Regions:
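Conserved N-terminal beta1-alpha1 strand-loop-helix module at the mouth
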Residues: 1-185, 190-213
Length: 213
Protein backbone atom coordinates (compact mmCIF):
# COMPACT_ATOMS: atom_id res chain seq x y z
CA UNK A 1 0.00 0.00 0.00
CA UNK A 2 1.43 3.36 -1.00
CA UNK A 3 1.97 6.08 1.57
CA UNK A 4 -0.92 8.52 1.94
CA UNK A 5 -0.46 12.29 1.61
CA UNK A 6 -2.08 15.21 3.40
CA UNK A 7 -1.66 18.69 1.93
CA UNK A 8 -2.32 21.15 4.75
CA UNK A 9 -2.81 24.90 4.88
CA UNK A 10 -4.82 25.19 1.67
CA UNK A 11 -6.44 28.58 1.09
CA UNK A 12 -7.96 28.52 -2.39
CA UNK A 13 -9.80 26.32 -4.87
CA UNK A 14 -6.98 26.22 -7.41
CA UNK A 15 -4.47 24.69 -4.98
CA UNK A 16 -7.11 22.24 -3.79
CA UNK A 17 -7.74 21.15 -7.37
CA UNK A 18 -4.01 20.68 -7.94
CA UNK A 19 -3.69 18.54 -4.81
CA UNK A 20 -6.70 16.40 -5.67
CA UNK A 21 -5.63 15.82 -9.27
CA UNK A 22 -2.10 14.96 -8.13
CA UNK A 23 -3.44 12.26 -5.80
CA UNK A 24 -3.69 13.77 -2.31
CA UNK A 25 -5.60 11.66 0.21
CA UNK A 26 -6.34 14.45 2.70
CA UNK A 27 -6.82 18.20 2.32
CA UNK A 28 -6.30 20.41 5.36
CA UNK A 29 -7.47 23.92 6.21
CA UNK A 30 -6.12 25.90 9.16
CA UNK A 31 -8.47 27.70 11.55
CA UNK A 32 -5.90 29.58 13.66
CA UNK A 33 -5.60 33.36 13.07
CA UNK A 34 -1.87 33.70 13.96
CA UNK A 35 -1.02 31.34 11.09
CA UNK A 36 -0.31 32.73 7.61
CA UNK A 37 -2.40 29.77 6.40
CA UNK A 38 -5.52 30.71 8.38
CA UNK A 39 -8.81 30.72 6.46
CA UNK A 40 -12.31 31.79 7.35
CA UNK A 41 -14.94 29.04 7.36
CA UNK A 42 -16.54 30.29 4.14
CA UNK A 43 -13.19 30.08 2.33
CA UNK A 44 -12.58 26.59 3.69
CA UNK A 45 -15.98 25.47 2.44
CA UNK A 46 -14.98 26.60 -1.07
CA UNK A 47 -11.68 24.71 -0.80
CA UNK A 48 -13.38 21.50 0.30
CA UNK A 49 -16.13 21.85 -2.31
CA UNK A 50 -13.45 21.03 -4.88
CA UNK A 51 -13.32 17.46 -3.56
CA UNK A 52 -16.73 16.59 -4.95
CA UNK A 53 -16.98 12.80 -5.17
CA UNK A 54 -13.23 12.21 -4.90
CA UNK A 55 -11.99 9.86 -2.18
CA UNK A 56 -10.31 12.65 -0.22
CA UNK A 57 -10.81 13.47 3.46
CA UNK A 58 -11.43 17.00 4.77
CA UNK A 59 -9.31 17.95 7.79
CA UNK A 60 -9.74 21.06 9.92
CA UNK A 61 -6.75 22.14 12.01
CA UNK A 62 -7.44 23.90 15.33
CA UNK A 63 -5.19 25.02 18.19
CA UNK A 64 -6.68 24.65 21.68
CA UNK A 65 -10.19 25.44 20.42
CA UNK A 66 -13.26 25.91 22.58
CA UNK A 67 -16.41 24.01 21.71
CA UNK A 68 -17.89 27.29 20.46
CA UNK A 69 -14.96 27.83 18.09
CA UNK A 70 -15.31 24.32 16.73
CA UNK A 71 -19.06 24.71 16.29
CA UNK A 72 -18.63 28.04 14.50
CA UNK A 73 -16.53 26.29 11.84
CA UNK A 74 -18.64 23.15 11.67
CA UNK A 75 -21.76 25.23 11.07
CA UNK A 76 -20.23 26.30 7.75
CA UNK A 77 -17.81 23.52 6.83
CA UNK A 78 -18.17 19.77 6.46
CA UNK A 79 -15.16 18.09 8.08
CA UNK A 80 -14.20 14.43 8.15
CA UNK A 81 -11.46 14.85 10.78
CA UNK A 82 -10.76 17.42 13.49
CA UNK A 83 -7.02 17.98 13.93
CA UNK A 84 -5.99 19.32 17.34
CA UNK A 85 -2.59 20.98 17.17
CA UNK A 86 -2.29 22.67 20.56
CA UNK A 87 -1.77 21.54 24.14
CA UNK A 88 -4.98 19.54 24.31
CA UNK A 89 -4.93 16.85 27.00
CA UNK A 90 -6.03 13.26 26.36
CA UNK A 91 -9.28 14.01 28.21
CA UNK A 92 -9.92 17.05 26.00
CA UNK A 93 -9.30 14.93 22.89
CA UNK A 94 -11.87 12.43 24.12
CA UNK A 95 -14.29 15.25 24.94
CA UNK A 96 -14.06 16.70 21.43
CA UNK A 97 -14.63 13.26 19.90
CA UNK A 98 -17.76 12.75 21.98
CA UNK A 99 -19.14 16.28 21.63
CA UNK A 100 -18.81 16.49 17.86
CA UNK A 101 -19.01 12.88 16.73
CA UNK A 102 -15.99 13.20 14.46
CA UNK A 103 -12.62 11.43 14.44
CA UNK A 104 -9.84 13.44 16.08
CA UNK A 105 -6.24 13.56 14.94
CA UNK A 106 -3.88 14.78 17.68
CA UNK A 107 -0.64 16.47 16.71
CA UNK A 108 2.24 15.66 19.04
CA UNK A 109 5.55 17.58 19.14
CA UNK A 110 8.62 15.35 18.92
CA UNK A 111 12.25 16.16 19.62
CA UNK A 112 13.49 13.37 21.87
CA UNK A 113 12.74 9.74 22.73
CA UNK A 114 11.00 11.06 25.86
CA UNK A 115 8.57 12.96 23.64
CA UNK A 116 7.75 9.75 21.79
CA UNK A 117 6.98 8.00 25.07
CA UNK A 118 4.87 10.95 26.27
CA UNK A 119 2.83 10.65 23.08
CA UNK A 120 1.65 7.20 24.16
CA UNK A 121 -0.85 8.87 26.50
CA UNK A 122 -2.84 9.71 23.34
CA UNK A 123 -2.62 6.29 21.69
CA UNK A 124 -6.10 4.76 21.37
CA UNK A 125 -7.57 8.02 22.74
CA UNK A 126 -7.14 9.92 19.48
CA UNK A 127 -8.36 8.26 16.29
CA UNK A 128 -5.10 9.25 14.60
CA UNK A 129 -1.75 10.61 15.73
CA UNK A 130 0.37 13.19 13.93
CA UNK A 131 4.04 13.34 14.89
CA UNK A 132 5.41 16.82 14.18
CA UNK A 133 8.67 18.56 15.05
CA UNK A 134 8.68 20.45 18.33
CA UNK A 135 8.46 24.18 17.51
CA UNK A 136 11.44 26.40 18.36
CA UNK A 137 11.34 28.49 21.53
CA UNK A 138 9.34 31.64 21.01
CA UNK A 139 7.47 30.28 18.00
CA UNK A 140 3.97 31.67 17.55
CA UNK A 141 2.72 28.57 15.74
CA UNK A 142 2.80 24.93 16.90
CA UNK A 143 3.35 23.65 13.35
CA UNK A 144 4.21 24.71 9.83
CA UNK A 145 7.66 25.83 10.92
CA UNK A 146 9.65 23.89 8.28
CA UNK A 147 11.56 22.01 10.98
CA UNK A 148 12.24 18.28 10.92
CA UNK A 149 13.07 15.92 13.78
CA UNK A 150 15.05 12.69 13.96
CA UNK A 151 12.78 10.27 12.09
CA UNK A 152 14.70 7.33 13.52
CA UNK A 153 12.98 8.03 16.84
CA UNK A 154 9.89 6.40 15.32
CA UNK A 155 11.63 3.44 13.69
CA UNK A 156 10.11 0.13 14.82
CA UNK A 157 7.72 1.83 17.26
CA UNK A 158 4.28 0.27 17.56
CA UNK A 159 1.01 2.20 17.90
CA UNK A 160 -2.63 1.19 18.11
CA UNK A 161 -3.80 4.44 16.49
CA UNK A 162 -2.81 5.07 12.85
CA UNK A 163 -0.17 7.78 12.64
CA UNK A 164 1.13 10.36 10.23
CA UNK A 165 4.52 12.08 9.91
CA UNK A 166 4.96 15.87 9.63
CA UNK A 167 7.66 18.45 10.23
CA UNK A 168 9.98 19.93 7.64
CA UNK A 169 9.03 17.48 4.90
CA UNK A 170 9.73 18.48 1.30
CA UNK A 171 10.34 16.99 -2.15
CA UNK A 172 14.01 16.32 -1.36
CA UNK A 173 13.66 14.52 1.97
CA UNK A 174 10.26 12.84 2.03
CA UNK A 175 11.45 9.48 0.64
CA UNK A 176 14.13 9.26 3.34
CA UNK A 177 11.59 10.29 5.98
CA UNK A 178 9.25 7.47 4.96
CA UNK A 179 12.07 4.91 4.84
CA UNK A 180 13.51 5.88 8.22
CA UNK A 181 10.30 6.37 10.18
CA UNK A 182 8.22 3.61 8.61
CA UNK A 183 5.24 5.95 8.31
CA UNK A 184 2.22 5.11 6.17
CA UNK A 185 1.11 8.75 5.78
CA UNK A 186 2.81 12.14 5.53
CA UNK A 187 1.60 15.69 6.10
CA UNK A 188 3.13 18.72 4.36
CA UNK A 189 2.43 22.44 4.44
CA UNK A 190 5.45 24.76 4.31
CA UNK A 191 7.36 22.21 2.20
CA UNK A 192 5.07 22.87 -0.78
CA UNK A 193 5.06 26.66 -0.56
CA UNK A 194 6.63 29.27 -2.83
CA UNK A 195 6.58 31.67 0.13
CA UNK A 196 5.09 31.54 3.60
CA UNK A 197 1.38 30.83 3.29
CA UNK A 198 1.43 30.65 -0.53
CA UNK A 199 1.28 27.17 -2.03
CA UNK A 200 3.24 26.22 -5.16
CA UNK A 201 1.20 24.00 -7.52
CA UNK A 202 4.46 22.63 -8.94
CA UNK A 203 5.77 21.65 -5.49
CA UNK A 204 2.44 20.06 -4.55
CA UNK A 205 2.62 17.88 -7.66
CA UNK A 206 6.29 17.02 -7.15
CA UNK A 207 5.80 16.18 -3.47
CA UNK A 208 2.92 13.80 -4.11
CA UNK A 209 4.82 12.20 -7.00
CA UNK A 210 7.86 11.71 -4.74
CA UNK A 211 5.71 9.93 -2.16
CA UNK A 212 3.63 7.80 -4.50
CA UNK A 213 5.97 7.45 -7.48
Amino acid sequence: MSCKVKICGLKNREDARTAIEAGADYLGCVFFPPSPRHVEPQNAAEVFDMIGDADVLRVGLFVDPSDDQLMEVLNHVRLDIIQLHGHETPSRVEEVRLNFGLPVMKALPIETAQDVEAARAYDKVADRLLFDAKPPKGATRPGGNAIAFDWNLLTDTSWDSPWMLAGGLNVENVKDAIAQSGCKAVDVSSGVEAEKGVKSPELIEKFIAAVKG
